[in-house]
Swiss-Prot record:
This is Transmembrane protein 33. Belongs to the PER33/POM33 family. Highly expressed in the liver and significantly in brain, lungs and kidneys. The gene is Tmem33. The chain crosses the membrane at residues 32-52, 101-121, 156-176. It is found in: Endoplasmic reticulum membrane; Melanosome; Nucleus envelope.
């Protein structure tokens, strides 16, 4: 019976598989569109003016993907505090908020990388399922590229976490340079606390700990000036107080 189940890729064509999993297919298409728009922003082949519009399109497409994923995870919407608390635990809700933070802001290359790379990783995973539905030996070159992406997934997730962390001072810099809004750093701080507390993606939290260990190792060397050491220790203590408690 398992071989004839319509949800399984074995024995089903690629089109049938995608039609059976309509919501996953819709997210796959929106992620591919996000990758396309993000790439045209990072590599402005059509001009700088068009690049800015692709920046917005990428974030809007990512917001759509995040909303669909959030609906998939929590299908029964309720206007209650308990439902909101549950939604804020979901990574898809985090990146829905992320997209809304930056969609109308000054285009920043650093802010597009998490959107681009998450979309690429998730799209690659679903593409492999589509290829399996098409046939186990179909498109071997594409399969090789997807396997390389999967092999480097941890490094990509660490790079995304690095972007998430260093976007915090970037939003403050944008505020003082006149390119950001007054509320943006505060809303982004809320996003960062959600990422720090994420149950499914600990990379942001782990990277904070790794950065603290590296900085402490450097400033404890005898060659480090005393005022630099004191400033760094005070900064570490301040950031640690801002960090949310993780169960």
């Amino acid at each position: 019976m398992a071989d004839t189940t319509p949800n399984g890729p074995q024995g089903a064509g690629a089109v049938q598989f995608m039609m059976t999993n309509k919501l996953d297919t819709a997210m796959w298409l929106s992620r591919l569109f996000t990758v396309y728009c993000s790439a045209l922003f990072v590599l402005p082949l059509l001009g700088l003016h068009e690049a800015a519009s692709f920046y917005q399109r990428a974030l809007l497409a990512n917001a759509l993907t995040s909303a669909l994923r959030l609906h998939q995870r929590l299908p029964h919407f309720q206007l209650s505090r308990a439902f909101l608390a549950q939604a804020l635990l979901e990574d898809s809700c985090h990146y829905l908020l992320y997209s809304l933070i930056f969609v109308n802001s000054y285009p920043v290359t650093m802010s597009i990388f998490p959107v681009l790379l998450f979309s690429l990783l998730h799209a690659a995973t679903y593409t492999k399922k589509v290829l399996d539905a098409k046939g186990s030996n179909s498109l071997p070159l594409l399969r090789s590229v997807l396997d390389k992406l999967s092999t480097n997934q941890q490094n990509i997730l660490k790079f995304i976490a690095c972007n998430e962390i260093f976007l915090m001072p970037a939003t403050v810099f944008m505020l003082f340079s006149g390119q950001g809004s007054l509320l943006q750093p505060f809303i982004y701080y809320r996003f960062l606390t959600l990422r720090y507390s994420s149950r499914r993606n600990p990379y942001c939290r782990n990277l904070f700990n790794e950065l603290r260990i590296v900085v402490e190792h450097i400033i404890m060397k005898p060659s480090c000036p005393l005022f630099v050491r004191r400033l760094c220790l005070q900064s570490i203590a301040f950031i640690s107080r801002l960090a949310p408690t993780v169960a």
